Regions:
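A short, basic N-terminal segment
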Residues: 1-41, 281-288
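Walker A/P-loop nucleotide-binding motif
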Residues: 41-63, 79
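Conserved AAA+ ATPase "SRH/arginine-finger" region at the nucleotide-binding site
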Residues: 76-80, 171-172, 185-198
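Mid-core helix/loop region of P-loop NTP-binding domains shared across ATPases and GTPases
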Residues: 82-85, 97-143, 152-156, 194-198, ...
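Conserved AAA+ ATPase "sensor/coupling" helix adjacent to the nucleotide-binding pocket
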Residues: 92-95, 166-167, 175, 193-212
Length: 288
């Protein structure tokens, strides 16, 4: 709606994950490198954790785009599944044909093992990426551990990347999942963007959208955006999108503190408020 007004070819602050807009902060780059390292070195498991909206899914999709034809990839986003559903989904993602009537756990594992052995013989690497892994049941997590038992004498046949919110770490330390937890040797916990990175992030997205044209963000606006969003990319997108819409309706091309405050009021302070103490701090910034 406002893109043409600001000389942009598209909305730079969409909430949908878009690899073209990937902003690699130092931490995001480290997380991506951890996944690549785990795959190349055949570590078996990689765990990437981080808060909601921090960019985990975008990094996941970017990883897939970086992998070449020597890597066979299965990607799972729906994690409200049973252990049998998991196996069926993995097999489907790899494009393995299953004979009707043979949909049992044993058959699924046998078929998958045959595929992985052929894949290994062809010099290829099989990767299973599971996003939103914090939603997996204990039974499914145990089944994932069992998949890592598929191996040759020298290496694991499948490399598994678990991506999830911080509570996944709390789940993995439970006694029932001790064996799985001990197998995960490559881990990275994503943190929010710093204040300078928030500014770079916004400028990066405007550049990708073929901007900024006449659009300007003041230093005060950048500072307030960081304060309200706490460096979480999804919140930054939501706040900037609303700020640009307000600027468009007011026929102005500068995003300043006033515009940012109006955007926060429109979205609602509760969207940005994580705790009572932080909420008081944010409310103070909003009313001054």
């Amino acid at each position: 709606m406002y893109a043409a007004y600001f000389g942009l070819k598209e909305n730079p602050f969409s909430l949908s994950p878009e690899p073209r807009y990937l902003f690699l902060s130092e931490q995001h780059r480290d997380a991506l490198n951890c996944m690549i390292y785990g795959i190349k070195e055949k570590k078996g498991f990689v765990l990437i954790s981080g808060d909601i909206g921090i960019g985990k899914t975008t990094i996941c999709r970017s990883l897939i785009n970086l992998l070449d034809d020597s890597v066979e990839t299965a990607l799972i986003f729906n994690t409200a599944i049973s252990d049998l559903d998991l196996l069926e989904t993995v097999i489907g993602e790899y494009g393995i044909a299953i004979i009707s009537g043979s949909k049992t756990k044993k058959n699924y594992i046998d078929v998958l093992n045959d595929f992985l052995l052929r894949n290994f013989a062809a010099g290829k690497t099989a990767v299973l990426v599971i996003d939103e892994a914090q939603n997996l049941s204990h039974g499914v997590l145990e089944q994932i551990r069992m998949l890592s038992n598929l191996e040759t004498e020298t290496e694991k046949l499948i490399q598994i990347i678990l991506i999830g919110q911080p509570e996944l770490n709390n789940t993995l330390i439970l006694p029932a999942l001790r064996q799985l937890n001990e197998r995960i040797t490559v881990r990275y916990d994503l943190k929010p963007l710093s204040s300078p990175e928030v500014r770079e992030y916004i400028q990066h997205r405007l550049k990708v959208a073929q901007g900024p044209g006449s659009l300007q963000f003041t230093k005060g606006a950048f500072n307030l955006i960081y304060t309200f969003t706490e460096g979480i990319p999804r919140r930054i997108n939501a706040l900037c999108d609303r700020a640009l819409l307000i600027a468009y309706t007011k026929n102005v091309s500068k995003i300043d503190r006033k515009i940012v405050k109006l955007a926060v009021h429109d979205i609602g302070i509760n969207y940005f408020q994580k705790t009572i103490s932080s909420g008081r701090k944010i409310w103070s910034r909003l009313t001054t």
